């Protein structure tokens, strides 16, 4: 029975899935917008939003927790130095998921994942596949 099991497996082992979401989170925090499949985007929200909430209070313990999840010192610095203060007044809902059509090869539904209130730029979204 699958009672109380709320996350998707996405045809990956646990370690592969966690590594994939860690890499996607680092890409999202670095570029502030990524393109991925819709199911991955919906599951990524559960991984990223608690990290941004963690970044709103800059304590040593929170920085260590963030480093444990991200494994990238530059992204931890950006999380606590730039993103945490940016979303200080927002009580959640830091990501926006926009449907982006279908992938040409296998017709998979695609989505843009972007940080809300990000500075506007003309850069194209980064593929996170």
UniProtKB/Swiss-Prot annotation:
<protein>
    <recommendedName>
        <fullName>Large ribosomal subunit protein bL17</fullName>
    </recommendedName>
</protein>
<dbReference type="GO" id="GO:0003735">
    <property type="term" value="F:structural constituent of ribosome"/>
</dbReference>
<dbReference type="InterPro" id="IPR047859">
    <property type="entry name" value="Ribosomal_bL17_CS"/>
</dbReference>
<dbReference type="GO" id="GO:0022625">
    <property type="term" value="C:cytosolic large ribosomal subunit"/>
</dbReference>
<dbReference type="InterPro" id="IPR000456">
    <property type="entry name" value="Ribosomal_bL17"/>
</dbReference>
<dbReference type="Pfam" id="PF01196">
    <property type="entry name" value="Ribosomal_L17"/>
</dbReference>
<keyword id="KW-0689">Ribosomal protein</keyword>
<comment type="subunit">
    <text>Part of the 50S ribosomal subunit. Contacts protein L32.</text>
</comment>
<comment type="similarity">
    <text>Belongs to the bacterial ribosomal protein bL17 family.</text>
</comment>
<dbReference type="GO" id="GO:0006412">
    <property type="term" value="P:translation"/>
</dbReference>
<dbReference type="InterPro" id="IPR036373">
    <property type="entry name" value="Ribosomal_bL17_sf"/>
</dbReference>
<keyword id="KW-0687">Ribonucleoprotein</keyword>
